[in-house]
Amino acid sequence: MKICIVTIATGRYIQFVEKLLDKITEHFLVDHDIHCLLFTDNDMDEVSENIKVSQIEHKPWPEPALKKYNYINTEREYLKDFDYVYLFDADVDIVDTVGEEVMEDLVGVLHPWKVLEDKSVYPYEGREKSTAYVSDSDRDRYYAAAFTGGKSKNFLKMAEIISARVSEDEENGIIAVWHDESHLNKYFNEYPPVDLPPSYMFPEELMGN
């Protein structure tokens, strides 16, 4: 299968990209044809035929996180030619084999810091004026934003809807409480993914505990 890894590395986060790509080569869907789409505000040329660099304008935090899916939506034509697309935060460290269990329509990782908490305290967007709003009665699972993906058509549908919602919020002067993660959780609340356990996004702070 033809796989595209998407990551966004603005400012100092560019330092993490080489390690991420090395770990993907070593551990992630190793029997498949892996490519990368890198969004960055750093000046850089194409580094290999399997890595496409998409330049974005430098913006202050939290815009680079908030607008992840807006950036992705600008590369729809490129991404639609892949079988699967996965989005990683640039500073994710892959420490073990990730295999074909992630090759679903969409996958989402249950948030490691939230999975044992009561649903009533999950940090969904609670303001009704935001397009990321999730009502108390609809609270179910809470997902981490640092890794998600699936079949390209499903992923691109998600990117299109989330980017439109982020833009609508922006027009109304609203920033969702946890930025792209709030919008991701709204989308997964409506279109549930295949759940991956928190071990897929284990916090570095807990390593060794």
Language-model-derived ranges and their functions:
Residues 47-59, 102-110, 209:
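Active-site regions of enzymes building and remodeling cell-envelope glycoconjugates
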Residues 65, 69, 90-92, 177-182:
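Conserved glycosyltransferase catalytic-site signature
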Residues 6-9, 38-41, 88-90, 110-111, ...:
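Short His-Asn-centered micro-motif
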Residues 71-118:
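GT-A fold catalytic core of metal-dependent nucleotide-sugar glycosyltransferases
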Residues 101-157, 161, 181:
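PAPS-dependent sulfotransferase catalytic domain
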Residues 137-209:
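Catalytic core and acceptor-binding pocket of nucleotide-sugar-dependent glycosyltransferases
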Residues 1-67, 74-81, 153:
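N-terminal anchoring/stem segment of glycosyltransferases
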Residues 36-45, 90-97, 199-201:
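Short, polar loop motifs at secondary-structure junctions
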